[in-house]
Amino acid sequence: MLLCIMFFKIFLITTLSMNAFSLNIDNPEGWRGVTDQVMGGKSVLSIDHEDGIFYMKGSVTTENNGGFVRLSKRIDIKENSYKGVTFKAKGNIEQYELHVTLKGIKMPPWSYLSSAFDVTDDWQEYQIAFVDLQSKGYMAASMRSDNIRDISIAGYGRDFDVDFAIKDIALY
């Protein structure tokens, strides 16, 4: 009987940990800011992390063929059981995007999948399903959670001020 109970506990812990994968936003390690300056653009971004919340501030400009800022994290998922990304966000009443980059061959090399979402100045919860992502370029890998290379939150494609906060990022 004791062996049966131990097996059941191990089964529950394993099952729950596989289905509750979290990107652990409380630990800022591995998250990084990226701007179009890597390709000659002039957008600027500062990122702060406090009490489990990331704060993105800056500006996106299309000057000099630029136009993006991103908060990005490389991840390594071993199973294909996740259906999307959930998070809480607020900001300056602008549109931001979730970007997902896949492993493997891409044309052009910076191709990604994305979904836009609008923020208000109040915290809102967002759930973005992988099936709702739109392709921005060609990727040889199919959209499966075990093919994800990184996940980013981006200000993209137009001139605007970035004032954005995000927390509780997780895969579901």
Q: Predicted regions span which residues?
A:
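Sec-dependent signal peptide recognition
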Residues: 1-13
